[in-house]
Amino acid sequence: MSSLYYANALFSKYPTATSVFPSGVFSEQTSCAFASSPQRSGYGNSPGGTFPAGSAAHGLFSNGSSLHPQSPAMYPSSYGLDAASFNMHCSPFEQNLSSLMCDPTKQNCTKAEQRDSELHNEANLRIYPWMRSAGSDRKRGRQTYTRYQTLELEKEFHFNRYLTRRRRIEIAHTLCLTERQIKIWFQNRRMKWKKENKASSPSSNSQEKPETEEEEEEEE
């Protein structure tokens, strides 16, 4: 008697049993590992490698009892677990994992964009002196000169009542003043000097004409 005949006679004694686990407890796609590889290593496609799962499981336990009780729920209701709890797929897990993980490169990009936008806004809000309005409604305060500045300007006026542009720049740098302030001071000082000499000298009218011409040349 061959071994194949003996095996067939042995397994024919037991009826075909159902699956070890009751139907409906586990879905077909329980996890990523079971979904990706339906066959396990060690079980080939040859006739000698196949093994009937139902009959073997039925033979392992006496009285045809299954591994788990034949109840519709695997765990009691107090655990709060049902058949839908085991139906896990790969795509929701990967989506949740990718949403929880933060990308440092994206954060650096957003910070760089915010910094560029702030610099751009500061550049737009920057106001230069030539952009300010020079209307008549602006009230300018009276310029006050220190004693040292007044003394140096008086000494310069004593030698030269009219200044060249180069000399005006030199005095402005020396006294920490602007060219406009030097020019205004000399204009006011010349007007004062004219008033002082008008009453003392009768020939003041003849001196006013060349002075006005020089003032026009200086303003240009």
Swiss-Prot record:
The keyword Transcription regulation applies. It is found in: Nucleus. Residues 211-220 have a biased composition (Acidic residues). SUPFAM superfamilies: Homeodomain-like. A motif (Antp-type hexapeptide) lies at residues 127-132. Residues 195-220 are annotated as: Disordered. GO terms for biological process: anterior/posterior pattern specification; regulation of transcription by RNA polymerase II. One of its GO terms (molecular function) is DNA-binding transcription factor activity, RNA polymerase II-specific. Residues 138-197 bind DNA. InterPro entries: Antp_homeobox (IPR050296), HD (IPR001356), HD_metazoa (IPR020479), Homeobox_antennapedia (IPR017995), Homeobox_Antennapedia_CS (IPR001827), Homeobox_CS (IPR017970), Homeodomain-like_sf (IPR009057). Belongs to the Antp homeobox family. Sequence-specific transcription factor which is part of a developmental regulatory system that provides cells with specific positional identities on the anterior-posterior axis. This is Homeobox protein Hox-B7-B. The gene is hoxb7-b.
